[in-house]
């Protein structure tokens, strides 16, 4: 199919997370939907749609993060590939799912490296923006490599065509916004091909992360107010346990450090605030 594909799999309003169906009893049955999605988070990120691609705006740290996370993803996927492609498009032939893609901050660099990238997000405005941006900034020959889908990860994983369809999944700065991490990870396992990688970056739940990633970050306008809830942060031990419980093999985790004075990221020996983790489906 030529050009990008825009798919919206929303089956309800983003503000509604349950539906009522007839029941044989005296009371209607309520079926809860999208248990990995928090409507408060959806509302918050819906307000940021126009800021996603501003490299000097409130989300600039995500843009600068590409300078370290893209090489990390690239290096690991080159190890995973059985053949070596042209250096200009080293990810050619790989299909990647970017979960919680926003408007494509990470998706587009991966596309330019040759990957077919499906960006998944529950915010309709982000999907619309990503689709529009793809048409505007990607060369015509790359537009068919970009697809933005409006869906939760568990809804997406419920579709037969998506099962074991991906060579890699990236969940960068996402799991700290998910109310049901176990369901999220189980759904990702269903989507990945065997012997494929899943990449996480997130925030540890420590006293230091409360001070640095919430109070200072929001107080200094490094992140939009209300972006992070410390209680949702996931420790490396918890993330490892969730992955092992869902039949992943954990390779390693590494600390990350962000310097807001120069808007730069670096790998760090300490993981008390930000960290990255690599796991694989056997």
Residue ranges, per PLM feature:
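N-terminal chloroplast transit peptides
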Residues: 1-13
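Acceptor-substrate binding/catalytic loop of class I
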Residues: 202, 221-238
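Core SAM-dependent methyltransferase catalytic element
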Residues: 264-282
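Short alpha-helix
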Residues: 231-247, 253
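Conserved alpha-helix/loop element of class I SAM-dependent methyltransferases that forms part
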Residues: 64-92
């Amino acid at each position: 199919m030529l050009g990008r594909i825009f798919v919206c799999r929303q089956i309800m309003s983003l503000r509604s997370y349950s539906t009522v169906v007839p029941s044989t009893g005296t009371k209607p049955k309520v079926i809860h939907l999208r248990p990995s999605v928090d409507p408060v988070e959806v509302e918050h990120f819906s307000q940021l749609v126009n800021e996603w691609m501003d490299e000097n705006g409130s989300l600039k740290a995500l843009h600068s993060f590409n300078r370290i996370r893209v090489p990390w993803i690239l290096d690991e996927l080159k190890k995973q590939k059985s053949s070596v492609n042209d250096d200009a498009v080293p990810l050619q032939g790989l299909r990647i799912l970017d979960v919680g893609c926003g408007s494509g901050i990470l998706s587009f660099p991966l596309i330019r490296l040759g990957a077919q990238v499906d960006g998944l997000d529950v915010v309709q405005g982000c999907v619309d923006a990503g689709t529009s941006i793809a048409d505007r900034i990607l060369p015509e020959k790359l537009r068919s490599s970009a697809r933005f889908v409006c869906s939760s990860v568990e809804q997406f994983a419920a579709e037969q065509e998506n099962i074991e369809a991906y060579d890699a999944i990236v969940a960068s700065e996402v799991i700290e916004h998910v109310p049901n991490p176990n369901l999220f990870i189980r759904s990702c396992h269903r989507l990945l091909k065997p012997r494929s990688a899943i990449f996480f970056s997130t925030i540890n739940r420590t006293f230091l992360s409360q001070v640095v990633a919430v109070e200072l970050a929001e107080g200094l306008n490094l992140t939009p107010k209300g972006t992070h809830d410390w209680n949702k942060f996931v420790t490396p031990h918890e993330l490892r346990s969730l992955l092992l419980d869902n039949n992943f093999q954990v390779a390693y985790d590494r600390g990350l450090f962000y310097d807001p004075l120069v808007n730069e990221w670096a790998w760090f020996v300490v993981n008390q605030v930000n960290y990255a983790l690599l796991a694989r489906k056997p």
